[in-house]
Structures are given as structure tokens and as C-alpha cells.
């Protein structure tokens, strides 16, 4: 981005009425940067969304919702504890049902128009271990859950300096904790991968693919997690 013909490198840059503002490069594919993260995970996991009914827990501006629709999803229920954040284009899309002011930990199947074929999860300031149960109750028996693990919100208070988890062993602990919580709800990890785009502060987030069925062998489970956090 340039302002008055010069690169604008700080968000605090003030702009006068007579200065020109220009943005170079291609426009973003999605309404939020999370869309790029989900798109990369869908490709790596080989997940096809064509015709699927999706639950987006922690929708925010709608990056995941936008990505899901562009990937062929039939419909999306966008859930977020906040209000007024979802991009206007999605808010007015007939394929999107918006549930604002709803904490994902309070989700109940009766709130949704359907049992989702797939759930995508991107939440902050709360551990995924508190959300797995309610989300699992809102999806179909054969559904897939793609949850993005943010290590900085999975580790205990006081363990994350500067808001960034840099140690691979701590990232492993965070992902393992989510996988263990999922197992309590008969969900097994089938795949794991580092998110393609780092978090705003540089945190390396990890997507886990969870599905019901036979438990993944411990050695395979640990290998999946290790590869994703290495």
C-alpha cells in the first residue's frame, strides 16, 4: 500500500484528504486471512467440500466461511461470540446462516438447522478442549472436524511469554492435549499439518483432522503430531 506515492509501513500512518491511496498486487482471495489457512489444510488433507453442510465455529470476519463456500460447500452456519464482525458479502449470502453472540462452548444441536457434514474451528482466548464436546454434538456421525490449534491458548497461564509459543515441545503438548480431549468424545486424529500462514504474532498453528471411528494407533498418532510441530 502506498500513501501519497510512498509505501505506508505503519498502521498509525495518518492520511490527509489530498493524499492518494493505492494498493498494489492481486486482491485477497478471501474476506479474512484465515481463508488461506483453511484452503491449505483442505488441500493437504484432501478434503472435498462440494455439497457439504458446514459449521464454522469462531467465524469472525468469515475467512473460513468464505473459503468453504468457494470450495463448493452447499451452506455454512457461521457462529461467533461477537457481533457485527461477519463480512457484509457473507451476511447477505443466502447460503450462510449467522449465529452471533453465541459462544461455541454453548452450542446445542437445537440451535442449528442441520447436523453438519463438516465443522471448521478457529477460536481465540479459549482452549479447544472446552469446545470439542459441544461441536461434536452438532455434527453428523460421519462428519469431519478440522480444528486449528493455537498453542498460545492451549497452554496454562504464565507459560506463554509475549504471546508466542516458540518451543516445539510446547506446541506438541498443546496439540496432544486437544487430541486427547477429542478422544474423550470418540473422535480420533486422522491427520495433522502446520497451518500455512503463521498467526499475527508469528505463532505456528496446527490443523488437526478429527473423525469418529476406531482410535488411531498411539505410534501413528504421535508421529502425526510430531510431523506437524517439528
Residues of each region from the PLM?
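S4-like RNA-binding module at protein N-termini
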Residues: 1-48
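Flexible, glycine-/basic-rich loop-and-beta segments that form/coincide
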Residues: 204, 209-230
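A short glycine-rich, Lys/Arg-flanked "PGG" loop and its adjoining helix->strand segment in the class I
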Residues: 129-146
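Conserved S-adenosyl-L-methionine
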Residues: 67-75
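Short, glycine-/aromatic-enriched active-site segment of Class I SAM-dependent methyltransferases
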Residues: 151-167
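S-adenosyl-L-methionine
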Residues: 74-130
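Conserved class I S-adenosyl-L-methionine
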Residues: 49-60
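Glycine-rich SAM-binding Motif I of class I
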Residues: 62-63, 84
